[in-house]
């Protein structure tokens, strides 16, 4: 009888099964790690442990992977399925010695010499009982509570108290065929393989648990001794005519206000609450791109998460997802408005550090905050902050605030040794709990002061909120970014470390825009966002169900056949499936009659639904522009369409943070899809297929309000070519309000003053404002914008502009 079949062993495994709850990282190793089920597979683990292998066995059975208890047999040669680098540790004395693992590696490698077709996949597996990183300078406690190399007694206690927090992590497989072909099969290669595995396990533990935590007061005293804070204390004392001791006490108060107080115990409690909460609120959370972030952590990068900001739930969602993806929740920069009892202390122990909305010229506070942020980077803690500065009320990305990005870039310039990498994150929801409040605020109601009831009050109305979406975008490594934007940055800083380089501000602005673009590049399309887009483009926010489903199928085809970026996610299924999901979420209404179902958006929430449409409007705005061009312009050729796209893309890029490298090529590929879908026929020019005209009309409706804005701007510029930016912003906003009142435009962003400010900056940059060279293009672009509008809207704009000129 084998050991694992003995009654004692079965009893031990049964007991462990009752005590242990295991989370697998990643959740689907076959897909996420590209494991090949047709090839043999072996596991390598750091330490030999009965409980670890039992936990691994439970997971392999669920995942359909080979059991660690089954011997690996290839060509008559038997080898253990699991190779352990260290023996078990006895209660007293030293760990068992020997190099049995070297023999195992040699046997696994040698069979490849005999069979040229063989390729064994060696998969590193790490197990964690709890994820406490430990404290700095806590030698006695570390000796008593040793987690990395526990005795069997210590392991029993760990299972008893931390069994519900067991993580099994699979890593990318090593091809032993590649190792044998490239390096040979002798003992030296086996030893090298073992060394690489040890380094891997050491790095993997740091990714899972994070660096050791500092003692808070010791950290404060160390920071107060830094050169920058010492200098700021002296300046504060001199300027405020107080003693240095008083200035130091004030600096200590600032540190206490700012600094996080991370607690692994609280994170474990929060994890249970959040698991309950997500299961109650959402049917699932869709994640894309987590593996690339895990790899960055493993490669030693300092990670800064820069997500978009939709809801207060963002703070919780991203930390929760990272925890379950085998990474440490980041230290989160939270607005000081969230530092209220009891939420503030809880957020602080969950990793939040607090930042004032404005530093207000307070040099001491600025020095304290910067030094604290530097310390986080130096120690290796991941950080998270929202570059928008606040939650978007319209569903579009807000213009970025550059303060935190500038401080992060300054930390790199000051010599952070590890590569610092920004990871843009797109967060999306089928239902944002605060969305009704946002529209009240946009309509003029005063924003309520933050309170625990405002943040969590919606939990009392728990319902079906659909799904959440977390997509990780293209990372930006700051050292590489600086090399690209300012190749001589190292020399410039070395010459005069205290002098702010002249290139820094424009580089920060470029970085901010790239972050926002990369967030939008990782957008998640959902049933709610896509059905909102279609229905809001219809005249009465209503369509026959068959027509709606057909339109959704067209959009899905465009998004899948011409992916916006590799980071964008598009739902599986058909238009019928998306409509069914929207009805289930009660975002849509259905009315039935003998002629068929009619799907609509309730007029009372139509404005609210613009929020969800705006989340992904950038994905469909160019197809919409192309559809409008095909419908409005007679004898429209491919060249005509590309010229229109080239005229308007720079404004769309600035307004919607778009990142299409070659708009002309993209437009041509969209036209190819239109032809393939039978929407148009192409000869010398395009001819719209009459039976498909409604599909093009609906598609063109998505950009209609955007084109109305552009028509207002260019009509104003034509009649007042010497307008200053401020005058253009004021006049265009006033005309937008008039147009909205006359034509029933309710989308909140249509009246957003900040949006017109963004566009005016871009117009100046493009040379369309006074004293620039692009004035000759204004008439052409105005005519193209006017052409793409309905005649009634076009006439209102023309009449209003001339009335404005005559006042």
UniProtKB/Swiss-Prot annotation:
Pathway: Phospholipid metabolism; CDP-diacylglycerol biosynthesis; CDP-diacylglycerol from sn-glycerol 3-phosphate: step 1/3. GO terms for molecular function: glycerol-3-phosphate O-acyltransferase activity. GO terms for cellular component: plasma membrane. Its EC number is 2.3.1.15. It comes from the Bacteria. It is found in: Cell inner membrane. Keywords: Acyltransferase, Cell inner membrane, Cell membrane, Lipid biosynthesis, Lipid metabolism, Membrane, Phospholipid biosynthesis, Phospholipid metabolism, Transferase. It catalyses: sn-glycerol 3-phosphate + an acyl-CoA = a 1-acyl-sn-glycero-3-phosphate + CoA. It holds the Pfam family Acyltransferase. GO terms for biological process: CDP-diacylglycerol biosynthetic process; fatty acid metabolic process. A motif (HXXXXD motif) lies at residues 308-313. It is an enzyme of class 2 (transferase). It is a peripheral membrane protein. NCBIfam families: plsB (TIGR03703), PRK04974.1 (NF003441). The HXXXXD motif is essential for acyltransferase activity and may constitute the binding site for the phosphate moiety of the glycerol-3-phosphate. Belongs to the GPAT/DAPAT family. This is Glycerol-3-phosphate acyltransferase. It comes from Shewanella pealeana (strain ATCC 700345 / ANG-SQ1).
